[in-house]
Regions:
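Hot-dog-fold acyl-thioester-processing enzymes
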Residues: 2-90
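Hydrophobic beta-sheet segments that form the core/acyl-binding groove
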Residues: 90-106
Length: 106
């Protein structure tokens, strides 16, 4: 199904295979530092360049929940939740399939 612009969808209006395109957003070092301060998650894999360079991914990785928060914001900006969402209650069966690094655009 092709990407489309939509406004205010209810759950029963979503279709299997439906795609909603968002703007891109590049992850910055400031995003990671700010999220660490906000969340209290100062894990070295996110915040310590030297430590992260020796870890599995070879460089600092964005927090999974930071990426989820940015994705949520991008989704809101499309308008598909406009006037139809009361609360974000569940993200079911989501996986982080690959790391997101500083400079990556999602």
């Amino acid at each position: 199904m092709s990407a489309q612009k939509v406004r205010g969808l209810y759950f029963n209006q979503f279709e299997i295979g439906m795609q909603i395109t968002t703007q891109g957003r590049t992850i910055t070092e400031s995003d990671i530092v700010g999220f660490a301060g906000l969340s209290g998650d100062y894990n070295q894999i996110h915040t310590d360049k030297t430590y992260a360079s020796k870890a599995d991914f070879g460089k600092r990785v964005a927090h999974g929940l930071l990426v989820t928060s940015i994705v949520s914001g991008l989704a809101v900006q499309t308008g598909f939740m406009e006037g139809t969402v009361m609360a974000f209650r569940e993200i079911s069966q989501w996986k982080y399939s690959s790391p997101i690094f500083i400079g990556d655009t999602i």
